[in-house]
A protein has these predicted regions:
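Active-site beta-loop-alpha junctions enriched in small/polar residues
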Residues: 1, 22-24, 66-70, 91, ...
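Conserved, mostly hydrophobic/aromatic
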Residues: 9, 86, 111, 122, ...
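Glycine-rich phosphate-binding active-site loops on the catalytic face of alpha/beta enzymes
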Residues: 17-26, 87-96, 136-157
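Catalytic cores of alpha/beta
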Residues: 1-12, 71-83, 125-141
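Glycine/Thr-rich beta-alpha phosphate-binding loop at enzyme active sites
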Residues: 34, 69-71, 75-109, 113, ...
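Glycine/small-residue-rich loop that forms an oxyanion/phosphate-binding "nest" at active or ligand-binding sites
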Residues: 1-56, 61-65
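Alpha-helix-loop-beta-strand connector modules within alpha/beta enzyme cores
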Residues: 41, 52-66, 102-123, 159-161
Length: 161
């Protein structure tokens, strides 16, 4: 329930809040499934989601929507004109040591066809996939393990560009 935390972030004067669309699923994901993979969504409570997007905008916060790897990008279609960014998770959140999910490149490309805001990618981003992602339309790359695992941050960052 991301909406439970919005006011705390607003009090911190943040500029943007990205939150998972999976939190707005009308179907319940079985607990056993959550323990082995990230949540996905097929039926979204758009009424609640649009209410929360509007709430953030009334507080001058840019709303961004995060998609887990198994969530199809078309769930964004009803709200694309209401949000400022999309964050594509290219690994399953909460499970460390994963490899980059290659289908994320196609997901970015699909989103970019109809969305002109920021497209961010997080998870397994490194020097071998960064160019593919930016060519597909991503303009913000989040890369922690690759950078922090490097002995030379400057070179690692240069290789991402």
């Amino acid at each position: 329930a991301p909406w439970l935390f919005f006011d705390a972030y607003i009090d911190c004067n943040v500029d943007e809040i990205c939150f998972h669309i999976e939190a707005y699923s009308k179907t319940v994901t079985p607990h056993e499934q959550i323990m082995t993979t990230s949540r996905t969504v097929d039926t979204v409570d758009y009424q609640r989601l649009e209410k929360d997007i509007y709430y953030l905008k009334t507080h001058d916060i840019k709303p961004g929507i995060t998609l887990n790897p198994n969530t199809p990008p078309d769930v964004l279609n009803p709200i694309l004109n209401q949000i400022d960014s999309v964050l594509v998770m290219s690994v399953h959140p909460g499970f460390s040591g994963q490899s980059f999910i290659e289908s994320s490149v196609e997901k970015v490309q699909t989103i970019r066809q109809s969305f002109h805001g920021d497209i961010k990618v997080d998870g397994g981003v490194n020097n071998t996939n960064a160019k593919k992602l930016t060519d597909a339309g991503a303009n913000v790359l989040i890369s922690a393990s690759y950078l922090f695992g490097s002995n030379d941050y400057k070179t690692a960052i240069d290789l991402l560009r």
